[in-house]
A protein has these predicted regions:
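Histidine-centered active-site microenvironments of extracellular/periplasmic hydrolases
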Residues: 383-416
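Proline-centered loop/turn at the N-terminus of a beta-strand
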Residues: 130-132, 378, 403
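Feature for exported/extracytoplasmic and membrane-associated proteins, marking the mature portion
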Residues: 2-354, 358-368, 390, 409-412, ...
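Beta-strand segments within the central parallel beta-sheet cores of soluble alpha/beta enzyme folds
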Residues: 324, 374-382
Length: 498
């Protein structure tokens, strides 16, 4: 499929460049082009629409509290009901809540039969001890707007501190880890790829190039089929224009030039990973494409193609190690369903769980000599908000805090954080669980929230080797406000990474 010139430029971070940082910091970033190198990969999976956390990590028993009783109060049975019974959850039991000791389960969709290589979904990865379930993830003064809340999570900036407006938390990591020499990434390399139509919020930055595409085999320089005789001249002109800009003494112009050149180089290099992967791993390619045949599976297939080429050193110039993809449909105001395999929420979780499971199997033999590289990969799963605690007629409305998942070969599997207090008397005026950073439990029965920035910080420090001081000075900013109600102290040891 041909792409337009406008789309071609949009495929990298060029479209996101701007004067969003202070002049001193901005110019300093451009002096350092390369990134601190490691052999690790990091993948972000976004559940678009607001995933219902209460029906994703479900109380099965009360423990010392009333979680199960409160769940049954808020979620009904019968026509339109989305409550799940303990019997329906028996196959997806995970750990217990750290505060109350109540038994928890993940949604039965995460134990779907799937296709060959994908059976068992996320539950099977839990059984292997490599799935972390992090409860009650949120931020202060939560927003019920899809766009605003997604922007908050992507920027890591709930209170809109100006130094971080317009750039993503991973984008700031990529820029902040630039080093002078030896250069694992040059000024025109691409450290990150988004399986999307344009660069997503997490990766927006003003110092590195990020590639956005849907299918590797479709990505290429936008030749003109009506005037093919002019194609070579147009590509030469493109290289000349952006090459001149790359040599500029102006930092902004230099970045634009390097981004244009990286786009043009990527159009020659990255599509090669498709043929290499399909030829060598046809059974997995078929399992993604025909076995599961879902958008999430196809997204992981594109990531697998790149990682395979990087691990085997098969395509010169391909060295991306940071990725993002998404799965939509989680805005379940109606017809959400419960444990029924035909239900909307079940199908969404089955799609995600089966795609991750198949990718997990693919990684087992992806390394040189068919070695297992799962210990090089960490996957973070998040959504812009959870859903309201009481259900509506047959679905759920916009909510506040909810669970995150982390999958990886070095992940310490388990349940982390406290399940939100869902007692109707403990909910706020929107019938959502409030954000709380004080004593656990709080004086009004509040359960301590896991600030999503502590999850990010744990990944940045324990997976990507940033110091806590660097994270807090260049990637994430602590809040100013009462300690019980705001993120005023970091905890970058949530526990899910060694």
């Amino acid at each position: 499929m041909a792409i337009t010139r406008r789309q071609f430029i949009k495929r990298t971070g060029l479209a996101t460049a701007g004067t969003v940082l202070g002049p001193g910091l901005f110019s300093n970033m451009f002096v350092r082009h390369a990134l601190a190198f490691s052999n690790r990969y990091f993948i972000v999976l976004f559940l678009d629409g607001g995933n219902d956390g209460l029906n994703t990590v479900i109380p099965v028993s009360n423990g010392s509290g009333t979680l199960r009783t409160d769940y049954e109060t808020n979620r009904k049975t019968g026509p339109g009901g989305i409550r799940m019974t303990p019997a329906e959850l028996n196959g997806t039991l995970v750990g217990t809540d750290g505060l109350t000791g109540g038994q928890l389960a993940i949604h039965p969709g995460f134990n779907d039969a799937g296709a060959a290589g994908a059976s068992g979904g996320l539950k099977s990865i839990w059984n292997e001890g490599r799935l972390a379930v992090i409860q009650g993830c949120g931020y202060p003064e939560y927003s019920l707007s899809h766009e605003e809340s997604r922007n908050i999570w992507e920027t890591g900036n709930p209170l809109f501190y100006s130094p971080y407006t317009g750039t993503g938390w991973m984008g700031r990591y990529l820029v902040g880890n630039a080093v002078s020499a030896p250069p694992p990434y040059t000024a025109t390399d691409i450290p990150a790829v988004n399986i999307a139509d344009s660069v997503v919020g997490e990766y927006k930055n003003t110092g590195t190039s990020v590639l956005a595409l849907r299918r590797l085999q479709d990505f290429g320089f936008p030749y003109d089929y009506d005037y093919p005789s002019e194609d070579a001249a147009k590509e030469i002109a493109f290289e000349s224009l952006y090459g001149t800009a790359a040599g500029s003494g102006n930092a902004t112009v230099k970045y634009i030039g390097n981004t244009g050149l990286s786009t043009e180089s990527a159009s020659q290099q990255y599509p090669q990973t498709h043929g290499v992967y399909v030829s060598a791993r046809s059974s997995f390619n078929d399992a993604y494409t025909n076995g599961l045949n879902t958008g999430t599976a196809r997204g992981f297939r594109e990531i697998a193609k790149i990682i395979y080429s990087v691990e085997r050193g098969l395509v010169s110039g391909v060295n991306a190690r940071f990725f993002q993809l998404s799965n939509g449909g989680y805005d379940t105001h109606s017809n959400q369903g419960g444990a029924d395999s035909n239900g909307q929420h079940y199908e969404l979780h089955a799609e995600v769980g089966n795609a991750i499971r198949l990718f997990w199997e693919d990684l087992k033999t992806m390394g040189a000599g068919n070695t297992d590289i799962r210990n090089k990969v960490t996957i973070l799963v998040w959504s812009e908000f959870s859903r309201r605690i009481p259900q509506n007629d047959n679905g759920t409305d916009h909510g506040s805090q909810g669970p995150m998942f982390v999958v990886g070969g070095t992940v310490n599997g388990g349940v982390y954080g406290s399940h939100p207090n869902i007692d109707p008397d403990a909910l706020d005026n929107n019938e959502n669980s409030p954000y709380w950073q004080g004593a656990n439990p709080g004086p009004a029965g509040q359960h301590r929230s896991t600030d999503f920035r502590d999850v990010y910080g744990t990944i940045l420090t324990r997976w990507l080797d940033m110091s806590q001081a660097t994270v807090l000075s260049s990637v994430l900013a602590l809040d100013a406000g009462p300690a019980n109600d705001y993120w005023t102290a970091a905890n970058f040891n949530v526990g899910f990474l060694p």
